[in-house]
Amino acid sequence: MNFRNCLLSFAAFGLVIALMAVPASAQTRVGEAAVVKNEVLRVAASSTTQIKVGDGLVRDEVVRTGRDSATRLVMADSTNLSLGPNATLKLDRTVFDDEHHYRDVAVRMTSGAFRFITGHSDKAAYKITTPLAAIGVRGTTLDILSQRGQTIVNLQDGAASVCTVTFECIQLTQPGDTAIITSGGGGRSTIKKTNNPPWTFAATCSAAAGLCSKTQYADATPVIVDDGSDPTGMLCGR
């Protein structure tokens, strides 16, 4: 093998090694933790890790709060998500339109108490679900309580559409309007509307300083978050 071919082979080998060094789990940052009180966990298939203020969030992330714990997450479009104690949330899907807006963002509120404040994205981009409800928003602040057998959706401002899994829907148009969905067994559920809400997130706001504040995303341009497995801290594509 002549010297030129040797150099080419070495360069190709180096490229393969460099590509292998980029962590496969590196993903686009879609938000960050703005408020963290006590146990706020990032839940993966085989492990859980504590989330700290300023930590980034990525797509398909599951966040869980413990007893006497709370957090507020700020998405890249400045959507604010507040979680009370013993809550579980999954960032199901996030598709960027540009660095300030989502084309599609899906959030699943599995259990617990939440406050959801929409950000800068088109309102049709937001898709919120619980085990019993699908919620569409229009410039909205919503309080959502997801419990076994029941979901309560309370409108603070804006407007929202709340549907059961069998597509029975009601519209929330006035502050205080509340949808209550109750499981009746056999995959069926009932939905009713009231303007005398049995619950709101307001009582949870005192759980942590700043929990019910609204802030803008500090860095609207999505960046890459790695899992710590790259010892150099350098990633391709930055």
Model-derived features with residue positions:
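Structural recognition of beta-strand segments within beta-rich domains
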Residues: G31-T182
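C-terminal interaction modules
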Residues: M1-T28, T48-K52, A76, G84, ...
